[in-house]
Design a protein with these regions (language model features):
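Phosphate-backbone recognition surface of nucleic-acid-processing proteins
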Residues: 212, 218, 224-303
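Nucleic-acid-processing active sites and adjacent nucleic-acid-binding tracks
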Residues: 25-57, 62
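Long, charge-rich intrinsically disordered scaffolds of nucleic-acid metabolism proteins
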Residues: 77, 87-209
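Intrinsically disordered, low-complexity and often Lys/Arg-enriched segments
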Residues: 1-2, 25-33, 336-348
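Short, solvent-exposed helix-loop connector elements
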Residues: 54, 126-140, 171, 256-264, ...
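Low-complexity, acidic/Ser/Thr- and charged residue-rich accessory regions of DNA metabolism proteins
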Residues: 255-256, 293-348
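Acidic, metal-coordinating catalytic cores used for nucleic-acid/nucleotide bond scission
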Residues: 61-74
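Gly/Thr-rich phosphate-binding beta-strand-loop-beta motif of the actin/hexokinase/Hsp70
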Residues: 2-22, 115
Length: 348
């Protein structure tokens, strides 16, 4: 026996579980299956069931589950606190793996079996829970974004209604009231986000350092920190760039050379929140960002492509300042940029 693996298909009410093992010949065998409730009572039953089937304690065991909304979080945290090795898989990654197995049918028990096999065959990255501070900050920033999107929806409806053939004044009034309420809630959330940041003096100090960049406000930075868990899981800026979907992917085959572009296979909330700051830092002529924009735009003449490059650089500088607890200094950043460019010029 090489490894034990438990696959969990988690929904709002129940958890379908499959306990499998893989031997020296890479053959995966289902040992046991069970269904428990997605609540503390079910978690305890799950832990007992896993312990019962984990007969050879010296053999590694991993628990594999999908990131299904928020339904997996309580179970994952419970198992993590029990010192279990937990891997949380993105739904699209799990889906492609199950398709590769040639499974034509789909139900909860089949998904649990597939996840168990995935955990047995692959060396998956282990999951760590987000700290309470950044988890609550993420709840604030995501709610802010949700309300912003709702305001946009209702404003579009209001605009359409006011330009229709017959205007229903009652509905116009109702929409205006909803927009007013949401706008009030946005202001309340802004204050709550600021208060939450201030509750941690170390984070607030770093926030003030970074917000010296013209165009980067507390809300933008709070969103980046919330989505990255305060950069705690990143060992390099390259990892962060990939996480945010700013990494460049090639499109080449044989003699054919296609266009390169960013992958966008990452956290879209980070890219969304850095959209406006990228415009602002260029407009305010912040040297490191303006230089990058000018240089890239002169190469290809595409404004948005240059602004994406600015977004990426902005994220990397935020990461560096936060990790090193340094205030933003445009002169210093400009010197660092020249030092990085010079070796490449000498090499060429």
């Amino acid at each position: 026996m090489l490894k034990y693996s438990v696959g969990l298909d988690i929904s709002s009410k129940k958890i379908d579980c499959c306990f499998s093992s893989i031997d020296m010949g890479q053959k995966v065998k289902v040992q046991s299956t069970v269904t428990v409730s997605n609540n503390p009572t079910g978690f305890n039953l799950l832990a007992d069931w896993i312990d019962k089937n984990h007969r050879q304690k010296d053999i590694a065991l991993v628990i594999c589950m999908e990131a299904t909304g928020v339904y997996y979080e309580s179970c994952a945290l419970f198992l993590f606190e029990k010192a279990c090795k937990v891997s949380v898989i993105l739904p699209n990654k799990a889906k492609k793996y199950l398709q590769a197995l040639g499974l034509k049918s789909k139900n909860d028990s089949i998904d649990a079996k597939g996840l168990a096999q995935m955990g047995a065959e692959q060396n998956l990255k282990l999951w760590e829970p987000m700290g309470k501070y950044f988890y609550e900050l993420r709840q604030f920033t995501r709610q802010y974004q949700n309300i912003q999107e709702q305001i946009t929806v209702y404003r579009n409806q209001l605009h359409s209604l006011k330009n229709s053939m017959y205007i229903n004044k009652a509905i116009v009034k109702q929409l205006e009231q909803v927009i007013k309420l949401f706008t009030k809630q946005l202001k309340e959330l802004e204050e709550q986000i600021k208060n939450h940041l201030e509750s941690n003096p170390e984070v607030m100090q770093k926030t003030e350092n970074i917000c010296k960049i013209k165009g980067v406000g507390i809300l933008s930075l709070a969103t980046v920190l919330a989505e990255t868990n305060g950069f705690s899981l990143f060992e390099s800026s390259r990892q962060l760039v990939s996480f945010a979907g700013y990494d460049v992917v090639e499109n080449q085959s044989g003699k054919r050379v296609g266009k390169t572009k960013i992958s966008k296979k990452g956290n879209s909330r980070i890219r969304r929140i850095l959209f406006m700051p990228a415009f602002t830092v260029v407009r305010c002529k912040e040297a490191p960002f303006l230089n990058l924009y000018t240089r890239t735009f002169s190469n290809h003449g595409i404004k948005m492509k240059s602004y994406v490059a600015v977004q990426k650089k902005l994220l990397v500088i935020i990461y560096s300042l936060y990790k090193n607890n340094q205030p933003y200094d445009p002169k210093r950043q400009n010197i660092q940029e020249k030092e990085q460019v010079l070796p490449s010029l000498l090499a060429s």
